[in-house]
Amino acid sequence: MNVDHEVNLLVEEIHRLGSKNADGKLSVKFGVLFRDDKCANLFEALVGTLKAAKRRKIVTYPGELLLQGVHDDVDIILLQD
């Protein structure tokens, strides 16, 4: 699977699992993405896909690396569809 395809799948999953934040942008908690069964089956490396999407300015989140448990409440914000 190529990175662009995985990033597109990530955008679809953020639409499915996310909700609008105060700024009107779609947002989902990292823990929600990480624990979702469909996401677990889709993404071999969710954190790597998130980093690729962040580099492309498709999503944003604080910091560079997200870890299960520690960062479950971190918002992943969709910047573009």
From Swiss-Prot:
Keywords: Acetylation
InterPro entries assigned to the protein according to its UniProt record, in alphabetical order: Costars (IPR044302), Costars_dom (IPR027817), Costars_sf (IPR038095)
Residues that span the membrane, as ranges: none
Positions of post-translational N-acetylmethionine modification: M1
Keyword Cell inner membrane: no
GO BP terms in the entry: regulation of actin filament-based process
Superkingdom of the source species: Eukaryota
Protein family (similarity comment): Belongs to the costars family.
Name of the protein this chain belongs to: Costars family protein ABRACL
